[in-house]
Regions:
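Receiver (REC) domain active-site loop signature in two-component systems and cognate sites
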Residues: 55-57
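Charged docking surfaces used in two-component/phosphorelay signaling
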Residues: 15-23
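C-terminal output helix
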Residues: 86, 106-111
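Active-site beta3 strand of CheY-like receiver
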Residues: 46-52
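Conserved acidic carboxylate
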Residues: 8
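Acidic catalytic/metal-coordinating carboxylates
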Residues: 33-36, 61-64
Length: 111
């Protein structure tokens, strides 16, 4: 079973993502900020297949978290979640190590 780390500060979006991923058969760990994601990732010895990261969060944002996770592992898939839809935002995410970018709002099938 694939293990996914979800980091999203908005409760409704995080719940939507988690519910849909669990329904699809994934093992999901969710947190609401970058600092908690680092803590969980470290405590779990990086035992995740994919990380879904919101970009705009208080404290450690998704860009910094993406860079940190990528320094820990080149194996984990990183997907950025954001309401930003400009091409440059997508390019920036890919340049810092993300594998994909999903624009909010999104449907369960996009996950």
């Amino acid at each position: 079973m694939k293990r996914i780390l979800v980091c999203e500060d908005e409760d409704a979006i995080r719940d939507f993502v988690v519910i849909n991923l669990v329904r699809s058969g994934y093992d999901v760990v969710d947190v609401s900020c970058g600092e908690d994601a680092v803590k969980v990732y470290t405590e779990q010895n990086g035992n995740f297949d994919v990380a879904l990261l919101d970009i705009m969060m208080p404290g450690m944002d998704g860009f910094a978290l993406c860079r940190w996770i990528r320094e820990q592992s080149s194996e984990i898939g990183i997907i950025m979640l954001s309401a930003k839809s400009q091409e440059m935002d997508k390019v920036n995410c890919l340049m810092i190590g993300a594998d994909d970018y999903v624009t909010k709002p999104f449907s369960p099938s996009e996950l």
